[in-house]
């Protein structure tokens, strides 16, 4: 079993070096924004990216790290859940931002997005979390993902800082955002 674990770890080292090469190639092409979310890859993608970045930490200054939060999936990460839920409480937003920072191995996120609008969304809770994360220097800018213009404006009215962006899903199979 010990040998199997050693081989597994050696394999992960190879994967992390390959991921680092990919990050460097992308940066060489002039692509500097890396868009993550706490839930991607069953909560593993940020940690893998962070492990690769730790091999060459000076690359951090050449990139913008983006993460999203607010969706809790029914996975091993949240064994208490039977269905996907949204959580935009002050505590959860801060907890997930801090988890992303830890997983990515950085002291700040350049941009934090709310992943999708929740049915029982409380903009005051979000504003409180954004204020705390901004004042602590943990997050430089904030935005949303897949909000309508009215929803964007509603949240903006509670904030003392401008929302930086509304990242919307658009593809051949998803054209709804062109309609509003």
Which sequence ranges carry the predicted segments?
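Active-site groove signature of glycoside hydrolases
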Residues: 101-122
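Acidic (Asp/Glu)-rich catalytic clusters
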Residues: 27-28, 52-64, 101-105, 134, ...
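A cross-domain feature marking catalytic cores of carbohydrate-active enzymes
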Residues: 1, 36-38, 67-69, 113-116, ...
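Beta/alpha (TIM)-barrel catalytic core signal, keyed to glycine-rich beta->alpha loops juxtaposed to Asp/Glu
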Residues: 117-180
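N-terminal binding-site loop/beta-alpha segment at the start of enzyme catalytic domains
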Residues: 1-67
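Short, acidic/polar
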Residues: 11-26, 86-105, 125, 150-154
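Structural preference for beta-strand elements that scaffold enzyme active sites
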Residues: 32-33, 62-68, 108-111, 139-143, ...
């Amino acid at each position: 079993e010990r040998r199997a674990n050693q081989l597994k770890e050696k394999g992960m080292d190879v994967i992390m070096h390959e991921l680092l090469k990919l990050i460097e190639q992308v940066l060489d092409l002039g692509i500097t924004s890396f868009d993550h979310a706490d839930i991607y890859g069953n909560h593993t993608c940020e940690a893998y990216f962070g492990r690769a970045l730790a091999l060459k930490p000076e690359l951090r200054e050449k990139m913008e790290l983006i993460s999203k939060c607010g969706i809790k999936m029914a996975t091993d990460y949240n064994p208490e859940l039977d269905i996907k839920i949204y959580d935009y409480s002050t505590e959860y937003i801060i907890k997930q931002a801090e988890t992303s920072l830890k997983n990515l191995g950085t002291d700040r996120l350049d941009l934090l997005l709310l992943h999708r609008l929740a049915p029982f969304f409380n903009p005051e809770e979000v504003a409180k979390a954004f204020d705390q994360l901004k004042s602590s220097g943990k997050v430089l800018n904030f935005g949303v993902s897949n909000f309508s213009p009215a929803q964007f404006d509603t949240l903006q009215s509670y904030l003392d800082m401008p929302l930086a962006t509304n990242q919307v899903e658009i593809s051949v199979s998803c054209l709804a955002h062109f309609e509003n």
